[in-house]
UniProtKB/Swiss-Prot annotation:
Transmembrane region(s): none
Keyword Disulfide bond listed: no
Organism: Dictyostelium discoideum
Chief localization: secreted
Listed name of the protein: Counting factor-associated protein B
Signal peptide: 1-21
Domain of life from the UniProt record: Eukaryota
A single GO cellular-component term on record: extracellular region
Amino acid sequence: MKLLNSLILLVLTCLVSSINTQFISIQKYDFSGNCKNSSDSASSFEASSESAAICMQNDLLSGIVTNEGVCLIFNEIPTTFLISSNGDYVVILLEIEQLKLVNVLLSVLMITTEVHIYFQLKHLSITHLIPTLKYLTMANVMDNGKLVLTIFNITLSINVMLHMKLKLIPFL
């Protein structure tokens, strides 16, 4: 299992770095109420109202620390980057133009992760969204007007905002 996780991490890192995204690396952190790098390099911790743990390293890189001790590092802070209170997933807000990247990530992450996609429905109807999706496994309209979709592949050309909920893999 450790070998599989390591292989997935390697493939993910290579794929993501090859398409010039903000994503830099996944690093191992000890999570015990603060952000402490296991290699004792400079890092700090902040907690937000969304129960998110934001990891800062050398004041240059930022990311999220999970309860499992995984820190996702970005060279720029994404528009929205939150972690659940129990640390089992992150929610990332992306522009739909980044869909190519999302497809690459999902093709790798779907091996061991659960992915939920959230679309803001301000100027779109559901009938415009559902036919553009492949392998749709669940679609629910929330009280706040968002369409929640659980899918295995995405083919979208709609100019909307995207919430991506990824269940994290603990790299032990």
